[in-house]
Amino acid sequence: MDLWFSEVHTPDVKLSLRTAKQLYAGKSEWQDIEVLDTPAFGKILILNGHVLFSDADDFVYNEMTVHVPMAVHPNPKKVLVIGGGDGGVAQVLTLYPELEQIDIVEPDEMLVEVCREYFPDFAAGLDDPRVTIYYQNGLRFLRNCEDDYDIIINDATDPFGHTEGLFTKEFYGNSYRALKEDGIMIYQHGSPFFDEDESACRSMHRKVNQAFPISRVYQAHIPTSPAGYWLFGFASKKYHPVKDFDKEGWKKRQLFTEYYTANLHVGAFMLPKYVEDILEEEEGKK
């Protein structure tokens, strides 16, 4: 008998994956956690019924989350990751020797342990000596930060449940305060294709645009995300993601990537017309 996992995107749309085996199922204080083995995407991590990432496509998310701000900020030393318990973002950050401190704020200790067991390649990033994990609420952690970080990455992907506070006006304001005078914040902007997701994208962009002088959005193709399309937010106190992009400097690093390139960096900010329209409408609101 075939076993299938289905993630509901809308009442009329599902993402369905043939499943070879359920590797893990448990419930932490914060969420339901499941790991499935699939023929098409390898192991997938599911939180509260939603695919967080898969072996096959997580490199896209991690590379676009990290390399974009690292290729723009001229001298980053300290990075804060809100969420990130799987270690994927940390693993890419550790490729940069100039980083002196990488702080991970993840409330769910069980999630970290599950990822260490079933996704050891990603979780290896958590073992770098520059990485410190704080098992705390991200919003509460930020309230005690001021002028501390060069880059903040909000690695929470959905504005629901225990991560809802990471998509509020307070969170973006606290992130602004926690950044140094030339700091950059990267956040997950979601997928704008379906109506409910579009509403969340609008809300995020409006709040960030009010909190930061520079607010831009870039894109990537991630097959397991809704509609296979994902947006990232780039918010900055000083640097523009394209005008201040150090293309030649990044290329000289000769880092191995599977998705991100210097040319793609610029192209990722060239958005479809319907997405531009959504963002421009929200930028006009106060």
Swiss-Prot record:
One example of a Gene Ontology biological process annotation: spermidine biosynthetic process
GO cellular component term, pick one: cytosol
Residue ranges of every copy of the PABS domain listed in the record: 2-237
Binding site for spermidine: 86
Pathway: Amine and polyamine biosynthesis; spermidine biosynthesis; spermidine from putrescine: step 1/1
Active site: 155 (proton acceptor)
Catalytic activities: S-adenosyl 3-(methylsulfanyl)propylamine + putrescine = S-methyl-5'-thioadenosine + spermidine + H(+)
Compartments where located: Cytoplasm
Annotated binding of S-methyl-5'-thioadenosine, by residue: 31, 106, 137-138
Domain of life where this protein originates: Bacteria
SUPFAM superfamilies, alphabetized: S-adenosyl-L-methionine-dependent methyltransferases
Top class in the EC scheme: transferase
GO molecular function list: spermidine synthase activity
Subunit: Homodimer or homotetramer.
Sequence similarity: Belongs to the spermidine/spermine synthase family.
Role this protein plays: Catalyzes the irreversible transfer of a propylamine group from the amino donor S-adenosylmethioninamine (decarboxy-AdoMet) to putrescine (1,4-diaminobutane) to yield spermidine.
Record protein name field: Polyamine aminopropyltransferase
Organism: Streptococcus pneumoniae serotype 4 (strain ATCC BAA-334 / TIGR4)
Taxonomy of the source species: Bacteria, Bacillati, Bacillota, Bacilli, Lactobacillales
